[in-house]
Amino acid sequence: MRFDAADAHWRETPRPGASSAQKDWLTRGGSLTAHLARLGRVTVRVTRETVAAPWADEHRALSCASRAPVWVREVVLAVDGAPFVAAHSIAPLAASKGVWQAMRRLRTRPLAELLYSDPEVTRSALVSRRVLAGHPLFSLASLALARAYATEHAFAARRSVFERRGTPLMVTECMLPALWRHLDAHGERRARGLEQT
């Protein structure tokens, strides 16, 4: 793996003030969608798919120029209707028409369908950070909440780079307050009354 999402802010070890649940979910390997599915029914809402420039803290992880065009896919992963994760995925524009072209056709299917079903795909280490106002991920998470939590001052997020045939695709996942509330109330179980659905 020649790509790495780590930098001065994104680190492999979660920040010291993170809760045990945050440390677990920020470092948990495998498909985040599959982990969420154990908590309830997962739905994917696509909020944006477009060509854009990478964020300031993204281009180095992809080994591309700071203004090189990338394909962006942003979604909200909801569990039983509550937004649990805001996700932002990017790939070099050329790759989104080549090696990673399937990401353009996912619609409301999770990206995990591509990433965990192909033996050619490898993954970098997971890195995480606390996201504050001013970072574009903070705005993305705030929009996902539809102003339901206007007082939220920070979010916990993680990211990693997937590689296929030498070409990167980076996934950044921002955990939303409803996830932590569910884990506080129910642990890794489905909410009461939803076990049979």
Swiss-Prot record:
Instruction: Cite the residue spans of the region called Disordered.
Output: 1-23
Top-level EC class, please? lyase
Keywords tagged on the record: Cytoplasm, Lyase, Pyruvate, Ubiquinone biosynthesis
Query: What biological-process GO terms show up in the record?
Result: pyruvate biosynthetic process; ubiquinone biosynthetic process
Which residues participate in substrate binding?
R73, L111, E173
One GO cellular component term noted in the UniProt record for this chain = cytosol
Q: In which pathway does it act?
A: Cofactor biosynthesis; ubiquinone biosynthesis
Q: Where in the cell is it found?
A: Cytoplasm
Q: Which InterPro entries match?
A: Chorismate--pyruvate_lyase, Chorismate_lyase_/UTRA_dom_sf
Coiled-coil segments on the chain, per record: none
Could you tell me which SUPFAM superfamilies the record lists for this protein?
Chorismate lyase-like
Where composition is biased (Basic and acidic residues), the residues are 1-14
Question: What GO MF terms are annotated?
Answer: chorismate lyase activity
This entry's Enzyme Commission designation comes to 4.1.3.40
* Reactions the enzyme catalyzes: chorismate = 4-hydroxybenzoate + pyruvate
- HAMAP family, per database record: UbiC
Q: Which family does it belong to?
A: Belongs to the UbiC family.
**Task performed by this protein:** Removes the pyruvyl group from chorismate, with concomitant aromatization of the ring, to provide 4-hydroxybenzoate (4HB) for the ubiquinone pathway.
Q: State what protein this is by name.
A: Probable chorismate pyruvate-lyase
